[in-house]
């Protein structure tokens, strides 16, 4: 089979319905818009969320929550990610060199998903209890900075 021999699967491509192209087409005159009314006019129709004058749902429901401006964003790393690095010491400097984080100001949290096979020393912002237990079990050290 060659590229010029490829064909679409039967029924996978539908022809575009051409409206307003004469009465014989079956889609002429009103062009599937019906007779008169707001929706038949050019530019007609109502805005999104309009419910005919009834107070719309988005105004009936109360406002809720907010986004805290003081929220800290952490880059999440799992033990399996640290294992792939295959290094004895893991800190911000190493992660920047390995292009895992963009700069040393980024906050990093280590989670316990996966496992490690050798002792590693970790100097990062946050470490979960399960990750800390796994690291210390193999003789590694965890330092939260």
From Swiss-Prot:
Residue stretches of biased makeup (Gly residues): 42-51
Keyword rRNA-binding: yes
Task performed by this protein: Binds to the 23S rRNA.
The keyword Plastid is assigned to this record: no
Entry keywords, A to Z: Ribonucleoprotein, Ribosomal protein, RNA-binding, rRNA-binding
Subunit (UniProt): Part of the 50S ribosomal subunit.
NCBIfam families reported for this sequence: rplO_bact
GO cellular component: a single term: large ribosomal subunit
Species in which this protein is naturally found: Mesoplasma florum (strain ATCC 33453 / NBRC 100688 / NCTC 11704 / L1) (Acholeplasma florum)
Protein name: Large ribosomal subunit protein uL15
């Amino acid at each position: 089979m060659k590229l010029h021999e490829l064909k679409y699967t039967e029924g996978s491509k539908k022809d575009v319905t051409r409206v307003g192209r004469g009465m014989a087409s079956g889609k002429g005159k009103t062009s599937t818009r019906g007779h008169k009314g707001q929706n038949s006019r050019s530019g007609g129709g109502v805005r999104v969320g309009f419910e005919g004058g009834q107070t719309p749902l988005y105004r009936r429901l109360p406002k809720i929550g907010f986004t805290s401006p003081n929220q800290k964003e952490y880059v999440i790393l799992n033990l399996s990610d640290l294992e792939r690095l295959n290094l004895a010491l893991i800190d911000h400097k190493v992660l920047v060199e390995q292009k895992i984080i963009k700069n040393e100001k980024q906050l990093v949290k280590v989670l316990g998903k996966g496992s490690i096979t050798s002792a590693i020393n970790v100097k990062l912002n946050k470490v979960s209890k399960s990750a800390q237990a796994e690291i210390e079990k193999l003789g590694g050290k965890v330092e939260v900075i």
